[in-house]
Design a protein with these regions (language model features):
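Solvent-exposed, non-transmembrane regions of membrane-associated and secreted proteins
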Residues: 2-147
Length: 147
């Protein structure tokens, strides 16, 4: 999936890779346990989402952005609910927001902006398939560090 949003041109193309960190994302309510691959912006300002594991992009202060394909590792992400818990690096986060948005209405600069409290922002494709790995909507979930 590819879209232009603010200063960031964001794309997710399948790429089979191994984890490059010891981090594990867990979402017990959907039986998700995923290794993490830390990713960086490509030269063309895109992000490449790894296939079958979660990609982690350190977006801004207190905002860890996690992406994964809806046909593989994030296939059940749509089943999470507000109040469900996620774990990353032995820290517990509680889901505070759950949105399904049209791709054309997403402001990536807002999704990736700095947060006041430590936050995980998860995103995956949703809706009708347009072409290849591109869909009409995105599931965007934010979870804040449990106090």
């Amino acid at each position: 999936m590819v879209f232009l949003a603010g200063f960031l041109y964001f794309g997710m193309q399948p790429q089979t890779v191994e984890a490059n960190s010891s981090l594990i994302l867990e979402a017990p309510t959907i039986n998700l346990t995923s290794p993490i691959r830390v990713i960086e912006l490509n030269d063309d300002y895109t992000l490449t989402s790894p296939d079958r594991i979660t990609g982690l992009y350190k977006a801004a202060t207190n905002n860890i952005f996690l992406i994964g394909h809806s046909t593989t590792i994030f296939s059940n992400l749509k089943n999470l609910k507000i109040g469900d818990r996620l774990t990353l690096d032995n820290k517990n986060y509680v889901i505070k927001t759950y949105k399904i948005q049209k791709k054309s209405e997403i402001s990536m600069s807002k999704v990736l902006e700095a947060k006041l409290t430590p936050t995980l922002t998860l995103m995956t494709c949703h809706g009708e398939k347009i072409s290849g790995h591109d869909y009409t909507e995105r599931v965007i979930i934010t979870a804040e560090l449990e106090k």
